[in-house]
Every structure is written in C-alpha cells, then in structure tokens.
C-alpha cells in the first residue's frame, strides 16, 4: 500500500459509506469536496473506476477518505488475486469479490492480500440486492435469496474473508449463523421518505444497524441532497442517537 495515502486517511467511526455514483472523476471529486472524511467513507464502483481509474482512488485517499473499491471481481483465481493486489497498492480500505467465484478464487484473493501491513478488508458479494427468487430461478438456482445468501456467506467465512455484502433483511440471520466479527456491508439503504429505485431489498439506516449490519452504503439520499454534508450529518446523528439507546 502506498504509505503516503495511508498516512492521509482520516479514520471515521461512522458506518456510512457514500456511494459515488458519478460518471467521471470531475463529478466525483467535486462532490467529495463537499463531504468530510471524518464523517464517512466512500465507495467507487465499476462505472466510475472504469472511466477514471486508479488515479481517482489515490486522489480520494490522499484527501483523507477511506475508499471501498466495489468492483466485484469474478474470474479465475490468479486473475482475481492480482486484481486484489493492485487494489491494495492503490490504497483502498475495502475491496470485494463475487462469492460465486468459489473457494479457490476467494482463498487466492485472501492470500494475495496477506502480506500487506495495512491490508484492505476483503468482502464477498452474495446475492445482488436487485435480485429476487424469480431472478435466481432463471439462472438455475432453486433457492430463496435468503437461503443462497447463507450458503455463499458461510463459504466466504470458511475461506477466511472478512465479511459479505448482503441486504439488511439477511443481516440478523448472518450474524447469528456466522458470528459478530464477520462484517456485513449493506447496500439498499434508504431514508424513510426515499423511493426504492432499483434495489428491491431496502431498509433504513437505523433498522439496518439493529438487524446487524456493520457498514451502510448510501447513495442517492446523500448524493442528490441539496446539502450533502447536512444530509450525511443528519443520518449520522440519527445513528448516534440509536446507538446511544442500545448501549
């Protein structure tokens, strides 16, 4: 990992990961300048990374942000291992792979990151939040989303990864089955008054935390807000109040 990038990171206790759903680096960096790295992390997905590349990730990290590189690597073991190493070299905080790539692929990814003193969290994707039982059936999987999530998440844990991406509806089940140290990253987070958009299995921030989620990926409620930092702070305040009641 680039030591200059690592030194520039601002550690945050907020579980919020803001999804940078922008088409290019200019838009993403302009938006990031309106946020505080002490109050959130950022997610860079396939569209943005494909258009802007490693330089964007390094620029965000140099500004103090911890970056989740959401590329969902899914290929032969050696290719995924090398991709994960490249992600670590760019200074990311978290990177993910598809659990459906299987044991050898996930173990190769884990081993590729083992030598880094500041190793990124390695997370696996189970079932995409846009998918329902009918979608799984069309690709030959005779299981409910919950059943398939548990199967893939168990395999992920057995391969030594840090956690999974899952919907909040599966969080309680996974915490019970796989333990509290197994991290759950939850997309599909919406505020109570937000439209569901294209993610079917959605939940509010505090409900997701109550269910067992560790990190909350939030996009439109923050990126489309007139004042993104104010929206982020309102969410963090709600989370702080909720967590205070739990302690």
Swiss-Prot record:
This protein's pathway: Pyrimidine metabolism; UMP biosynthesis via de novo pathway; UMP from orotate: step 2/2
Active site annotation, chain numbering: 72 (proton donor)
Pfam families: OMPdecase
Keywords linked to the UniProt accession: Decarboxylase, Lyase, Pyrimidine biosynthesis
Enzyme class: lyase
Superkingdom per UniProt: Bacteria
Its EC number(s): 4.1.1.23
Stored InterPro entries: Aldolase_TIM, OMPdecase, OMPdecase_AS, OMPdecase_bac, OMPdeCOase_dom, RibuloseP-bd_barrel
Reactions accelerated catalytically: orotidine 5'-phosphate + H(+) = UMP + CO2
GO molecular function: orotidine-5'-phosphate decarboxylase activity
GO CC field: cytosol
GO biological process: 'de novo' pyrimidine nucleobase biosynthetic process; 'de novo' UMP biosynthetic process
CDD domains for this protein: OMP_decarboxylase_like (cd04725)
Disulfide-bonded cysteines: none
Binding site for substrate: 21, 43, 70-79, 129, 190, 199, 219-220
Subunit and partners: Homodimer.
Family: Belongs to the OMP decarboxylase family. Type 1 subfamily.
HAMAP family, A to Z: OMPdecase_type1_B
Function summary: Catalyzes the decarboxylation of orotidine 5'-monophosphate (OMP) to uridine 5'-monophosphate (UMP).
Protein name, entry field: Orotidine 5'-phosphate decarboxylase
């Amino acid at each position: 990992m680039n030591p200059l990038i690592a030194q520039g990171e601002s550690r945050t206790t907020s579980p919020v990961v803001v999804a940078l759903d922008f088409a290019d680096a200019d838009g993403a960096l302009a938006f990031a300048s309106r946020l505080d790295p002490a109050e959130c992390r950022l997610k860079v997905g396939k569209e943005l990374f494909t258009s802007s590349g490693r330089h964007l990730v390094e620029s965000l990290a140099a500004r103090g942000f911890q970056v989740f590189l959401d590329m969902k690597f899914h290929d032969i073991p050696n290719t995924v291992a090398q991709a994960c190493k490249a992600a670590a070299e760019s200074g990311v905080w978290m990177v993910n792979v598809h659990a459906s790539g299987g044991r050898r692929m996930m173990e190769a990814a884990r081993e590729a990151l083992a030598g880094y003193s500041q190793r990124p969290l390695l997370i696996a994707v189970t079932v995409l939040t846009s998918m329902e039982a009918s979608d799984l059936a069309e690709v030959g999987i005779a299981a409910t989303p919950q059943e398939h999530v548990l199967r893939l998440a168990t395999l992920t844990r057995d391969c030594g990864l840090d956690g999974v991406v899952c919907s909040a509806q599966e969080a309680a089940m996974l915490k019970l089955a796989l333990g509290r140290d197994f991290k759950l990253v939850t997309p599909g987070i919406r505020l109570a008054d937000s439209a569901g958009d294209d993610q079917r299995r959605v939940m509010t921030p505090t409900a997701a935390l109550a269910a067992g989620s560790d990190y909350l990926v939030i996009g439109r409620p923050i990126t489309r807000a007139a004042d993104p930092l104010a929206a982020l702070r309102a969410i963090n305040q709600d989370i702080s109040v909720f967590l205070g009641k739990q302690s």
